Regions:
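Bacterial Sec-dependent N-terminal signal peptides
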Residues: 1-14
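Generic detector of ordered, mature protein regions
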Residues: 2, 28-30, 134-136
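Intrinsically disordered, low-complexity regions enriched for glutamine and histidine
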Residues: 7, 34-35, 115
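Aromatic-rich carbohydrate-binding modules that target alpha-glucans
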Residues: 13-58, 68-88
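The feature marks proteins involved in alpha-glucan
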Residues: 53-62, 66-141
């Protein structure tokens, strides 16, 4: 009976931030797997994955999100779409909903800020089955 329980346990997805820029001291890429893997964030429950960014370009960066095993990457509908930085811990943060036309490999979100404005940023992705996927960013000033 214990074996059945272990078999039913869900394996965490491999979720990646794709960028050509240097994040956390590591040059990224737009391939899967990338050098920037998001980790499950149990404080949100469901299938939310997060990446804390403590070292980033001076005034902004661009990115897409990929889930290993999926043929298309999550991206905004238009290139350079701005992504709002929510204050850390914001209830109901402003997020970008991933609709059916938000998959591909040509567009990227743009995250902008002033130099030294944030101590760190956290990129969050909710890929919970049966809900609209979404991406949001929180910042600690």
């Amino acid at each position: 009976m214990l074996m059945l329980g272990a078999m039913l346990e869900m394996k965490a997805a491999d979720v990646y931030l794709l960028t050509a820029q240097t994040i956390n001291g590591v040059v990224g890429n737009y391939a899967v797997p990338s050098n920037h893997q998001l980790a499950p964030n149990t404080s949100y429950g469901g299938n939310v994955y997060s990446l804390n960014i403590t070292s980033m370009p001076a005034t902004g960066f661009w990115f897409r999100i990929a889930v290993s095993g999926e043929s298309n990457q999550m991206q905004p509908k238009v290139n350079d779409a701005p992504l709002t930085i929510n204050d850390e811990g914001t209830q109901n943060p402003t997020s970008y909903s991933i609709d059916s036309d938000c998959y591909g490999n040509s567009n990227a979100w743009k995250v902008s800020y002033t130099a030294d404005q944030y101590e760190y940023l956290t990129v969050n992705v909710d890929i919970t089955d049966g809900t609209t996927r979404r991406v949001w960013i929180e910042g600690k000033k």
